[in-house]
Design a protein with these regions (language model features):
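Active-site-adjacent loop and "lid" segments of alpha/beta metabolic enzymes
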Residues: 8-104
Length: 104
């Protein structure tokens, strides 16, 4: 299993989003890819537009909303699994994305 290590020593958007948008590169190795983006600081930075997260960032619930969106996008791009705190929210987002593709 490959885990790109989102957030570890990489607090900013500029270090984490390329790992997500480059998911196909990891998949090309033939190993399953695990995305562990749940509640990471870079999600706060995405919501505030600050580049890196500050102490007064979004709530965990707000981070969970973005985590769910990133889970759906990760699934769409072939992630084998995602690690999340709010399973129900991410599951619903992945189901919605899969349903969308069925009717596209």
């Amino acid at each position: 299993i490959i885990d790109p290590g989102l957030g570890f020593s990489k607090p900013g958007i500029e270090h984490n989003l390329p790992l997500l948008t480059g998911l196909e590169t990891f998949r090309a190795t033939g190993y399953p890819v695990l995305i562990g983006q749940s509640r990471k600081r870079f999600i706060s930075a995405m919501l505030t537009g600050a580049g890196t997260a500050g102490a007064d960032g979004p709530t965990m619930a707000q981070r969970d909303d973005v985590t769910a969106a990133l889970s759906a996008l990760s699934a769409e791009h072939g992630a084998w699994a995602v690690r999340v705190h709010d399973v129900a929210k991410s599951r619903a987002a992945v189901i919605a994305g899969n349903t969308w593709r069925e009717y596209a």
